[in-house]
Every structure is written in structure tokens, then in C-alpha cells.
Amino acid sequence: MYSEPVTAVHCFCFWGERIVLVDVTGRGISIPGGHILTGESLLNGLRRELAEEACITLDSPALLGAVECDHSANPAFGPSLGYPRLASQLLYAGTVNRILPFTAKYETSRRIFVPALKCPEQFNEWDAVMQAAFEGALAWMAG
């Protein structure tokens, strides 16, 4: 289903009719998520990233799909970046079960709750991959 290793996980987090977005330094407005730490399970990494970036917890997140990251043709890629040449990033959807007080302690400067259908307008770098994942997240939410 996806190439190993998985280096990052991200999630469309639903709170009622809204989606949680975060403003991440260097990335802009996006869904929360980030890199998996060495030895960390994918779901534990996702839970940690959501707690750090958005100060939320989720009920059972559902895997929507994977994005394969192939740096073979990237002239800027090198071992010093600390990433493998071929890896995957996973995209999830989930329902927020707890909202904690927001603290801009990690990479995020703010957390916002936007109507789900307005998510593409708010997002910093929306593309065909995010659109497909978003449609999958909406379908998952609709049951």
C-alpha cells in the first residue's frame, strides 16, 4: 500500500462540521502532522504530532492513503538532509475527542477551526493530492 519507511503522518481532524488547521512555521496553514521519531509507531507519532501542533486528541484515526516521496530527481537532496531517497507520508482522518488549551510551544503559531468545505481556501499549498485526500476525508466523515 505504501513504501517504507514512513517518515511523516498528517491528519484531517474533524470537530463537528469543522476541520482543525494549524499555522506551521515554514509551512503555513495546513493540517496538523509531522515526522515520525525513530522507534515510534505510526499512530503514536500521529498522536504526538497532533498534541504538539494542535493541542488535540482523536478517536481512532482512519488511514486515507499515502504519498510516495521520491527524491531521485531532486538535485538538492543529499544524505545531510536526514531523509531517505524513497519514503512515504501517510494521510489520516479522525474525529477530535478533546481540545486542550493551545500553546504555541512547538512549530505552530496558531490553531484554527474552519468549516470543512472552506479547508481548501485556507490551506497554504493545496494540490491534486490534497484534494483527493480531502475528498476521502469528507467521505469518511459522512460515514
Task: Describe the role of every protein-language-model region.
Residues 89-95, 102-133:
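NUDIX/MutT-family hydrolases
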Residues 14-53:
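Conserved Nudix-box catalytic region and its N-terminal flanking loop in Nudix hydrolases
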Residues 1-10:
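Acidic, metal-coordinating catalytic segment for phosphate/diphosphate chemistry
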Residues 57-67:
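A short coil-to-beta-strand element that immediately follows conserved catalytic motifs
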